[in-house]
Amino acid sequence: MLLFLAVLVHNAEEGVAYPFSRPDAMQLAQLTWPAVQFPTVIEFQMALVLLTAAVGAVLAWAANTRREPQGWLALKLLASVFLANVIVPHVPAAILLGGYAPGVITAVAINLPLSLWILKHRREPSS
């Protein structure tokens, strides 16, 4: 499924870029939220692996029930989450970090248009 590939590529970008941007993000966060605790690189990457697996499981279930309202609703819900994920953390973080934040390239170039397409697309009629 296309959305799973988008999530996989996006989370891979985040996982690879996080170690390099973590110090800058921590320094920036200290100005506003001094008590914030950032995950270690390993914690962050493991969270991405678990999140990717969970999304894959939900998408596999949704694909098997795509003609049912609950499968289509699950797909629309995930697309909404990924659309919000572009708007809320990635774009503002990239601006605050001077132009790049982990995941912003795939968020804007892949997740944004794909999420909008899924949300606009109509459910297939039941057979």
Where are these regions (language model features)?
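Aromatic-anchored segments of alpha-helical transmembrane domains
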Residues: L8-A12, S80-P89
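A loop-to-helix transmembrane entry motif
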Residues: A35-A53
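Membrane-interfacial loop-to-transmembrane alpha-helix junctions, especially the N-terminal start
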Residues: M1, Q70-L78, S127
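Juxtamembrane "helix-exit" motif on the non-cytosolic side of transmembrane helices
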Residues: A62-R66, I87-L96
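Transmembrane alpha-helix/helix-exit interface in multi-pass inner-membrane proteins
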Residues: V7-D24
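Non-cytosolic membrane-interface motifs at loop->transmembrane helix junctions
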Residues: A93-A109
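Perimembrane loop-to-helix junctions flanking transmembrane segments
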Residues: P23-F38
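Terminal transmembrane helical module of multi-pass membrane proteins
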Residues: L112-S127
